[in-house]
From Swiss-Prot:
It comes from Gazella subgutturosa. Component of the cytochrome c oxidase (complex IV, CIV), a multisubunit enzyme composed of 14 subunits. The complex is composed of a catalytic core of 3 subunits MT-CO1, MT-CO2 and MT-CO3, encoded in the mitochondrial DNA, and 11 supernumerary subunits COX4I, COX5A, COX5B, COX6A, COX6B, COX6C, COX7A, COX7B, COX7C, COX8 and NDUFA4, which are encoded in the nuclear genome. Component of the cytochrome c oxidase, the last enzyme in the mitochondrial electron transport chain which drives oxidative phosphorylation. The respiratory chain contains 3 multisubunit complexes succinate dehydrogenase (complex II, CII), ubiquinol-cytochrome c oxidoreductase (cytochrome b-c1 complex, complex III, CIII) and cytochrome c oxidase (complex IV, CIV), that cooperate to transfer electrons derived from NADH and succinate to molecular oxygen, creating an electrochemical gradient over the inner membrane that drives transmembrane transport and the ATP synthase. Gene3D superfamilies: 1.10.287.70, Cytochrome c oxidase, subunit III, four-helix bundle. InterPro entries: Cyt_c/ubiquinol_Oxase_su3, Cyt_c_oxase_su3_dom, Cyt_c_oxidase-like_su3, Cyt_c_oxidase_su3-like_sf, Cyt_c_oxidase_su3_a-hlx. This is Cytochrome c oxidase subunit 3.
Length: 261
């Protein structure tokens, strides 16, 4: 972006939306190729181009905001509205999965044996790994709030410590979820119980990985002194997203693990 004399969010033409769309096409096509023909070539190509696009797009945004000063108060306000709308769209996305779950579980059909969980399904014990996962995510919610308050108070060391703890808890959650999937006595193909369980918890797990990536980027940016107490929207957006992931898990735990078992 060349020199600008206004306070609004008008960026230069960028190739990244196009390469991002093409990488998404490659990933979805690659997923189909993997499922039907057991070939991962297209999927790997899609993932690689997607990672490259994300890296270069975020690099441009960081340059515009941190080094060129284009993220004026007006621009930050617009970005906040954008992030709020994005989180609302994610809430609606998960509402669809909860709707599918309750539609199937509140009035089980004769094919399911007229009961929930369906006949033949051994559900996971909600007081074992799922409860540990809940406490891990709740603890990460506390540590991200600690990081946010430390940043606003200008305490860089505490902010980095709290952010590192949050990332570690996010990675721990992902490992626990992976071990739970590995040991689960049912699969995604075990009727409506398996499909609603794995799709809802799997998409949540994907969001935890995305949120952890977001926080890792913030961690490295803070190591380079990118955030100040009054200019840190990148971190704020990551914190909002992490709280959203936290709340969704509480609903998943109460609905699918505890009530649904």
């Amino acid at each position: 972006m060349t020199h600008q004399t206004h306070a609004y969010h008008m960026v230069n033409p960028s190739p990244w939306p196009l390469t991002g769309a093409l990488s998404a096409l490659l990933m979805t096509s690659g997923l189909i190729m993997w499922f039907h023909f057991n070939s991962t070539t297209l999927l790997m190509l899609g993932l690689t181009t997607n990672m490259l696009t994300m890296y270069q797009w975020w690099r441009d945004v960081i340059r515009e905001s941190t080094f060129q000063g284009h993220h004026t108060p007006n621009v930050q306000k617009g970005l906040r509205y954008g992030m709020i709308l994005f989180i609302i769209s994610e809430v609606l996305f998960f509402t669809g999965f909860f709707w599918a779950f309750y539609h199937s579980s509140l009035a089980p059909t004769p094919e399911l044996g007229g009961c929930w969980p369906p006949t033949g399904i051994n559900p996971l014990n909600p007081l074992e790994v799922p409860l540990l996962n809940t406490s891990v995510l709740l603890a990460s919610g506390v540590s991200i709030t600690w990081a946010h308050h430390s940043l606003m108070e200008g305490n860089r060391n505490h902010m980095l410590q709290a952010l590192f703890i949050t990332i570690a808890l996010g990675v721990y959650f992902t490992l626990l979820q992976a071990s739970e999937y590995y040991e689960a006595p049912f699969t995604i193909s075990d009727g409506v119980y398996g499909s609603t369980f794995f799709v809802a918890t799997g998409f949540h797990g994907l969001h935890v990985i995305i949120g952890s990536t977001f926080l890792i980027v913030c961690f490295f940016r803070q190591l380079k002194f990118h955030f100040t107490s009054n200019h840190h929207f990148g971190f704020e957006a990551a914190a909002w997203y992490w709280h959203f992931v936290d709340v969704v898990w509480l609903f998943l735990y109460v609905s699918i693990y505890w009530w649904g078992s």
